[in-house]
Amino acid sequence: MLKTSITAFALLAMVSGCADVPQATEPAPASAPLKITSWNVEHLAERNGEGCRPRTDADYADLRRHADALAADVIALQEVESKAAAERVFDPARYDVVMSARPKGRRGGVCYGKPGQTIGHQAVGFAIRKGIRWTRNDDLSALALGNPDLRWGVDVTIGSRQPVRLLAVHLKSGCNSGRSQSDPDCPVLFDQLPVLERWIDGRAAAGETFLVLGDWNRRIAARGDVFYAEIDDNEPAGADLSIASEGQAAGCKARYREFIDHIVLGSKALTRMLPGSFEEYRYDQPEDRHPSDHCPVSIRIKP
């Protein structure tokens, strides 16, 4: 699909709810809606051949192609080894990259199902298009629960006239539904819940416009999800949350029809989201050649 302007691309996304790979476009002008994206880049390493998803120069070039086609203004990143790794995909001449300050963990070990490959550091961060005003707030280190192998949240504010607070997260994996006490992952995820809720409640109490986005490792849009119900309580006022996908089915992988990557908006942020602008980016490659095991998800908000 050819896109002749940012406006046309935005209108098409609002109608379709998903996006195939478009041609790369120029950044949006200051008055245009901002495209806010979350992308788990799957074990993105600094150097070729390392980590649980060892890559070649051609693989990094393919990721850059998709990053250009995505044409996002702000991208929350997950599973990125370092700033240097992110800058192999997001050109530092075009993007400011900020990564969590979490020290590299001691986890190491062999990648699951991949003998001889060693897991690398997984950090959360942002790539922010140059020209967008932003400030960094303290990382939400409490999400790690004192465990050096759990990820921190990264907290930035974009814009100045009508600022938006963004928290990028990558929550504990392995508890995508329910609350089984026999599953060792569920108690950890639910210990992260009050940390996340305190951040949300703090933003709502301060009257801020905020989003929480990233890899939640949880099907929070499922009917009656107990994790989401606990944070979506509208206490204090303004903490009434909305999930941007609005019940749409995921299409990145044939086996999985429910999202675990989410953009969650507070009530003030929802008023600035362009209706129908949620989209799941689709790679123009067979699933076994996808450059990551997650597809980016995006919305557009009024600046």
What spans do the regions from the language model cover?
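Active-site beta-strand/loop signature of hydrolases that rely on acidic residues for catalysis
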Residues: 36-41, 66-87, 127, 156, ...
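N-terminal, active-site-proximal structural segment of metallo-dependent hydrolase catalytic domains
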Residues: 18-121, 194-197, 284-287, 293, ...
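Bacterial N-terminal signal peptides
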Residues: 5-16
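Positively charged n-region of N-terminal signal peptides that target proteins for export
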Residues: 1-4, 215
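Solvent-exposed loop/turn segments at secondary-structure junctions
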Residues: 41-45, 80-84, 102-106, 132-134, ...
